[in-house]
Amino acid sequence: MKERDVNDAQETPPPLEGKVSAGVLAVVVYAAAFASDRWIPNSLLSLPLLIATLIAAIVTWWGVPKLRGLKLGQVIREEGPQAHLTKSGTPTMGGLLVVPVGVIVGGLISWSGQAAEQLLAVAFITLAYMVVGGIDDWRSLTKHTNTGLTPRGKLLLQALAAVIFLIWAGMRGWISGDVALPFDINLPLNWLIWPLAVFVFLAESNATNLTDGLDGLAAGCGALVFTGMALQLTLRGNSGDPSLAGFCMAMAGCWIGFLVHNRNPAKVFMGDTGSLAMGGALTAVALLTNSLWPLLIMGGIFLAESLSVIIQVWVFKATKGADGIGRRVFRMSPLHHHFELGGTPEQLVVPGFWLATVFLVLIGIFFKPN
């Protein structure tokens, strides 16, 4: 029996190394950008992608020891997967290093006109969400717990930043009251677009936050979704979109550069500082370019992660008995932990979710609005 167990262990393939899967992801993103610049008129995606990647990788390499010196080590929740306890103390708040890189590189694409002001507005909301995430991370670190701001406090700050952005966009007439769908279909929402926009800001940023639970997971998915958003904007060719497409590629580049240090085994985590900024930037671009539909499809992993938490909590509360115990749909939520506890190693869950995002991006491009 022992000999058989040894043979079985020898036949089990080792988990995919983080640097290999991260390298493949980077090749996919760069190939898409180069192909767009080669064959699509007015496409300029490769340059901001390359510049942001290089700067982000260097800044993160420089910044990780600084974060470690400040003792900004992640506190791992004890009720999570036990294998994650070994990650305790890994520097967090890495978003502080790379989000400004993406914002600055993306913001330098256009210097005048409406495009420049839109880039400024997107930069504002991205940095505002980074600050909210930073406050949350800092409170968590100073309290030595896995929780920072209260959920209500965090949502209020996010909503306030979103409302300021929407007032700015509304005064300039940048946001359409119709939601563009495939096949020349437009969903007329009129004034309802405004409460929907606030909801999407809150939902998307918290969904990207929930996705940031495994080494490289959120960074890789974010890089792919930003790339997909840029490609569909370039293909649609609407006025003003090329600048925002370039901004998306700068953000994709900053996350690829971050992934050099965040892939398994991670030397740094993005924290809420990075994940909230990621969701805020994606939502802002989607609203300004009437791309809520593509974002919904391409960000399907973010949606699935968020829904898994909602379903888990709802079912548990609905079935809770007198003993205080309820049923669970998933082994643990968010969704990536369900697969982990099912025996799939982290090094396979992450590239699996990346691959799913690639397919979702392709679907979003194929069924893009006109």
Swiss-Prot record:
Q: In which pathway does it act?
A: Cell wall biogenesis; peptidoglycan biosynthesis
Task: Give a yes or no for keyword Nuclease in this entry.
Answer: no
**Which EC number(s) does UniProt give?**
2.7.8.13
Assigned keywords, A-Z: Cell cycle, Cell division, Cell inner membrane, Cell membrane, Cell shape, Cell wall biogenesis/degradation, Magnesium, Membrane, Metal-binding, Peptidoglycan synthesis, Transferase, Transmembrane, Transmembrane helix
Enzyme class, UniProt record, top EC level: transferase
Location within or outside the cell? Cell inner membrane
Q: What is its main location?
A: membrane
Which family does the UniProt entry place this protein in? Belongs to the glycosyltransferase 4 family. MraY subfamily.
What's the name of the protein?
Phospho-N-acetylmuramoyl-pentapeptide-transferase
Q: Which organism is it from?
A: Synechococcus sp. (strain CC9311)
